[in-house]
Amino acid sequence: MDVTDELRTRVRGLIQAMPGAQRDFAAGIGLDETKLSKALSGARRFSAGELVRIAEYSGVTVNWLLNGSDEAKTVTAVPAPAARSIRVPTDLEPRRRILETAWQLIAERGYHRVRVADIAKACGTSTATIHHYFPTKTEVLNEALRRNVKLAFDRQVAELHAVQDAHQRLLRLVELQLPKDGLLRDEWSVWLQVWNESAINPKIRSLYWDSYDRWYNTIAMTIRSGQEQGVFRVRDPDKATAQLTALIDGLGIQVLTGRPGSSVAAMREHLHDFIDQNIAAKPVR
């Protein structure tokens, strides 16, 4: 049984374990039932986005879908235990909706301007229901961060597991980190607030660093892989990682804060130039 056969088998198992029929599962992941049936039969492949939605809806990771284990070695670093979402065997959908809504509100309004009552109103539920799942607003934020770490991990595994060339994989990682309008810009907005909060609240720092380290280690392992392949120059991979991640952070802040002349396109160009001139075995241009 190859990887794609095993993937289909795992998805079938998830469908059987979830309440409702296959059409309900398809609706839950936002996929046409015919496309789901074709993917399960092998007539088409699951896209990266579909794998992420299946994992999110079912409460598993894309790494588990592809490799059979959350801990399996893959192309990105696995989240530290402290940065992982709490496993909940039931009530996945209400929790997901609360965390997704809270994340969106925090991205748009700011953490300190969002009340539990605001989250409840946006979810169409009561504050008591929110408190049933998350006793405090801080716990909502912490679990929303863990969920975001999982989603980033899922996206990276889904997008990159078949990309063998480390240079191309690094460029794709950069692309997945750009603060484009929509989901990625919202993520940057929340993480900027987390940086600020962790600077004045030591209690949140360990979760922040556990979360950030997964991203940092993913860049580091990609650079090491490129050195082994001969596509990246032989130099200290930790130093190169520190420089590249610092550049990504700084340029991202400039884009989000509207610095004149900054843009996603300019950020991409600066990062590609840095990789070409400082990491690639030979300058590309």
Task: State what each model feature region is.
Residues M1-M18, R87-T90, P94, W103:
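A short, Lys/Arg-rich alpha-helix, primarily the initiator
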Residues R44, A48, D70, L92-E100, ...:
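An amphipathic alpha-helix adjacent to DNA-recognition modules
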Residues G49-W64:
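DNA major-groove recognition helix of helix-turn-helix/homeodomain DNA-binding modules
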Residues L105-E139:
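Helix-turn-helix
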Residues E143, A158-D186, T241-L244:
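Hydrophobic alpha-helical connector segments
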Residues R169, L183-R205:
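Amphipathic alpha-helical segments used for helix-helix packing
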Residues L183, P202-E228:
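Amphipathic alpha-helical packing segments from all-alpha helical-bundle domains
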Residues R205, W209, Q227-N278, K282-R285:
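Hydrophobic/aromatic-rich alpha-helical bundle segments in the mid-to-C-terminal region
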